[in-house]
């Protein structure tokens, strides 16, 4: 948008606005997908261990968090190894 268009009050066409927004979204997604795993995974794992430990005695090694991307599908897998129940 030029200065003259701005001063005269001419508006951008909706198609060009939509195209610019799509380019921004695509650039954002591409930059985020280049990284292997999200930054929040270690914190998520620690918090899960803390919450589960309130109810069941587990070690940090008993919980595994795995994040995987395939094409446009993202999978967050959480595996928890629970201790065997003892008879009372």
From Swiss-Prot:
Pfam families: MinE
Disulfide bonds: none
Highest taxon in the source lineage: Bacteria
A single GO BP: cell division
Gene3D superfamilies hit by this protein: Cell division topological specificity factor MinE
Keyword set, alphabetical order: Cell cycle, Cell division
Sequence similarity: Belongs to the MinE family.
Purpose of the protein: Prevents the cell division inhibition by proteins MinC and MinD at internal division sites while permitting inhibition at polar sites. This ensures cell division at the proper site by restricting the formation of a division septum at the midpoint of the long axis of the cell.
Protein's recorded name: Cell division topological specificity factor
Organism, as annotated: Acidovorax ebreus (strain TPSY)
Gene name tied to this protein: minE
């Amino acid at each position: 948008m030029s200065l003259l268009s701005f001063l005269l009050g001419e508006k951008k066409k909706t198609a060009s606005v939509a195209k610019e927004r799509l380019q921004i979204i695509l650039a954002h997604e591409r930059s985020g997908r280049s990284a292997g795993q999200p930054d929040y995974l270690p914190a998520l794992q620690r918090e899960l261990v803390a919450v589960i430990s309130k109810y069941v005695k587990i070690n940090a090694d008993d919980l595994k968090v795995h994040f995987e991307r395939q094409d446009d599908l993202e999978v967050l897998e959480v595996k928890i190894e629970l201790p065997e129940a003892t008879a009372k």
